[in-house]
């Protein structure tokens, strides 16, 4: 079994990865590589490899952005309507704020986890380290308005609180959902 990347035991200016001293080099990350079903991550990872780059960062799908957020064109973190992939399965209930049905925070989306595992495996084949972001602050109200953890977007009624309180312990049910996701 491969070991995770770690600080080099003899020189903390380097990492140790695959039993070799490693410097992580990147110029970009596609935060939406997994959560955006339209994004071709295989081509992206092959492009990183061919350019001698070996690091990417991607988000879990708990946080996403709307098209045009931060004035970014073709933002991979802003999937098209109905295209967000995240850890939780879609329900049969219409009404997700960016198209499609609401999420069920008690059921996992097997397609999402298959895509995540394939992304990480492909990154490994391409020699790319993945920094996986489980949670991200909701910088603006519209971003919280897109989250599956927002009560408006799930059938469980969980997450009825202001965006600034999402990662506090204020909502025990939401905290339980977050803990379950981390364990998964």
Predicted regions and their residues:
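Short acidic, Pro/Gly- and aromatic-enriched capping/linker segments at domain boundaries
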Residues: 1-14
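Active-site mouth of glycoside hydrolases
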Residues: 10-12, 18-184
């Amino acid at each position: 079994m491969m070991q995770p990347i770690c600080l080099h035991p003899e020189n903390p200016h380097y990492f140790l990865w695959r039993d070799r001293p490693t410097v992580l080099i990147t110029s970009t990350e596609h935060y939406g590589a997994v959560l955006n079903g339209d994004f071709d991550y295989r081509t992206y990872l092959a492009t990183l490899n061919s350019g001698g780059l070996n690091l990417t960062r991607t988000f879990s799908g708990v946080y996403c952005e709307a098209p045009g957020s931060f004035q970014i064109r073709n933002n991979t973190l802003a999937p098209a309507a109905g295209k967000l992939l995240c850890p939780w399965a879609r329900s049969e209930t219409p009404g997700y704020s960016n198209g499609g049905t609401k999420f069920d925070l008690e059921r996992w989306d097997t397609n999402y986890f298959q895509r995540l595992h394939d992304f990480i495996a492909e990154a490994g084949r391409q020699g790319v380290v993945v920094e996986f972001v489980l949670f991200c602050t909701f910088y603006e109200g519209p971003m919280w308005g897109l989250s599956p953890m927002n009560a408006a977007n799930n059938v469980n009624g969980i997450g009825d609180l202001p965006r600034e309180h999402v990662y506090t312990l204020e909502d025990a049910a939401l905290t339980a959902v977050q803990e379950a996701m981390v364990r998964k």
